[in-house]
Amino acid sequence: TTALISLGSLLLLVCDGGRALPEPQACGVVPEAWRFDCYPERGVVVTRELCEARNCCFIPASSSPPALGRNGVPWCFYPPGFPSYSLVSVNATDLGQTGTLVKTVKTYYPKDILTLQLGLLYETDNRLRVRITDPSESRFEVPIAVPKATEKASSPAYSVELSNEPFGIIVKRTSTGAVLLNTTVAPLFYCDQFLQLSSSLSSQYIYGLGEHRSSFLHDIHWNTLTMWARDVATSSLLPDHDSILYPLTNLYGVHPFYLAMDEGGTGTAHGFFLLNSNAMDVVLQPGPAITWRTIGGILDFYVFLGPDPTSVIGQYLEVVGYPAMPVYWALGYHLCRWGYGSSNATWDVVKNMRNYGIPQDVQWNDIDYMDRSLDFTFDPTAFSTLPDMVKDLHSHGQRYVMMLDPGISSVQPEGGYWPYDEGLRRGVFINHTDGSTLIGKVWPGLTAFPDFSDDVTHEWWYDNLKRFHDKVPFDGLWIDMNEPSSFVDGSTVGCPDTELENPPYTPGETHTHLSHLTSSHYNMHSLYGLLEAKASCPEAYVRKRAFVISRSTFPSQGQYSGHWLGDNRSHWKDMYTSIAGMLTFNLLGVPLVGADICGFSEQTEEELCVRWTQLGAFYPFTRNHNSIDQKPQDPPAFSPAARSAMKQSLLLRSSLFPLLYTLFHRAHTHGHTVARPLLFEFPKDVRTYGIDRQFLWGKSLMVTPVLDPGVDYVVGYFPQGLWYDYYTGDSIRSKGEELRLKAPLEHINLHLREGAVIPTQRPNTTLFVSSGQPLHLVSSLSEDGSAGGELFWDDGESIDTFETDQYAHVVFTVVKVPGSTNTITFTSSLPIASYITVETASFYGVKMEPTRVMVNSHDAAFTYRANQVRLGVRSQRLSVF
């Protein structure tokens, strides 16, 4: 049972020099786990005098000093009864309730807003929205489209209780009475540049809150997660000492959403989303409790009731938008590096991949393809053959992706650089308050930054893309440095000494001023990557589905782009943490995600690169990328044995493309995850809650990679049930236990959960070729002989095929016919698409050798191996309808 400490109890006061101080006995009743920090400013040694000047309790913590990246138990904390808002009126509305909040005692932060408007919106049976706003003055609200409820939920899965004095909101799950949100645990702050909301958590099991380097399951023991989009190489954040994980510093994206499992292993889950784009700190403490501190905007948040984890994510994505359906080749193998040096050197790598028969769908170039790092150019000398290379890629069914940065050079001769000249003419750049163009510094030198919140900028950006596409017919875009990043503080003239630049509280993003590496647009800063992605979708000029990979992300990003996890290192630890990043972004609605395979910085090692390629074959987005001046790490650069192991991993991925494509369809239409944590499928198994060394594709295919050097085995957890080795069909009946699995260097362990049918196909070196191959179906039978699965299929690149019914949806069902132990009926349903055929099928879990196998009433050849309980059917190609 979670103990909640309400600050609504009586406050005993004593006088000390004219200040009202809390009575020591009142301070002593607050357990350490429920101390909410009254002096959160960084870089300050908090003394008793400073603390008591805020009328707060000061008690040194009993525990030892905190570890790196943690705050530790606060010594200065709010006493019971600390002044907060009061709820003075409540009225019913068509959608819920509205109320007025009043504060009579000002806080220690400037510009308190003393009267607030409360809005409770019962939007659906599983979604509650709460808005706390300033009724007298408009404040910034995040400009992303969210659904507008038109009627109040009729049978909500939640109840809402309001505390009048102090004001607080308590949200409970009606089916169990579990408390999901209780904001009475600490005072509410609502100042012009400081908003703070605290709440209890339903358990210690909390996920999401990107983007940071951490384990998938967050540690709630005094961790602070800062959210403010920032250009920082993750490789610079990773200490080598094994006893330390990672400082939870803020990275490229901002995602103020969490999923929490309810207490007690009930399997129920809920979600919370704060729709705010300003810089913020999110503090986790062992109460369990959470505090949100932000320096602008409003408090606009949602509670999602689930009740299971998959439903929570679907409900969250109903608000911010389902991810786009990717173009088919986006799911192939991508190859890149910074420092190819020339188009011919790039081309040679592609040719080597072909010579060795290693799958490759997409070739990329980093910034070195540009002429003097200028966007929308290519080096006329070193990359003179770039158009020819792209033409060659297209002739082989391959694609080309290039990098773009948002910074536009501002120092080229007038009339000599159309992007800047035309941008200046149209007024698309971010300005100083005096109307002059804000100038920063990025790779090409002094630069101006497009204002992607303006539709005029979108038109200018499109014109630039179209002009360049006419010269180099690229197929997708890699948008980088879009936090946005600048190499100078704010601009070349620095930052003004104003209240805006010096807020009373600065979230901890490790720099002295928030203007570092950014311009000073607090409200819009963390939205920049999202807005650029919206402007960058090349559908209009390639007339196919867009492919965009963005470094900076924000809620709703999945509608417009995928994401790679940033500049990692060629270290085993980095490979491990990539799984947590991949799973987290699947929760956040950006399923097209992956890390730089083999590592971006530092020299990779052959064993590491083999193991990472095996893992990377199961990233939803799989790309090998490394830095300038590092040795090559494309597969042909390694020994024959390593090269062969990498090739087999990539062929394996290619063979599983029908499954992966179908999973992305489910993500696009239902908000499902593609790469999925085990807890989503086994929410009542508490042992799955912390697993981030294994994961699932969809419901049924479990991946157990090797993440440590020098081993030929791996330990994996198998939830209760029947599992089959994907390669052999050998069965494992687990009670919910860890098992040691053989894992020689050329092998990655895959297991199928009982009751699945997954579609596969014969692999090839490009998805353009392999996607036309007949299907091979793999069925893993349950104890009762049943299994099921599906296939979504279309042309792979046309826009809105699902919305316009230009697709096939096949449902596979395996059942045991009553009265027979050896007969299996295989059925499917399909509205169109006679071009889909099934060539072979395998059934794992057939306990007795059949005497006869028939397909469409005709005898079919088969093989049976009792030690593998596998049935293979080979016949004439079978049309699935």
Which sequence ranges carry the predicted segments?
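Accessory, solvent-exposed terminal regions and/or long lumenal/extracellular loops of proteins
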Residues: 244-245, 747, 752-858, 872-877
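Catalytic-domain carbohydrate-binding cleft regions of carbohydrate-active enzymes
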Residues: 21-30, 76-85, 90, 177-754, ...
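Classical eukaryotic N-terminal signal peptides for Sec-dependent ER targeting/secretion
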Residues: 1-11
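A low-complexity, Ser/Thr/Gly/Pro-enriched, surface-exposed linker/loop concept
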Residues: 82-100, 112-155
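Solvent-exposed beta-strand/loop surfaces of large extracellular or lumenal domains
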Residues: 145-147, 726-745, 852-875
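Secreted, propeptide-processed cysteine-rich mini-domains
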Residues: 19-48
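Extracellular Cys-Trp
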Residues: 40, 50, 55-71, 75-78
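Short, well-ordered beta-strand segments enriched in hydrophobic/aromatic residues
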Residues: 97-101, 120, 130-132, 157, ...
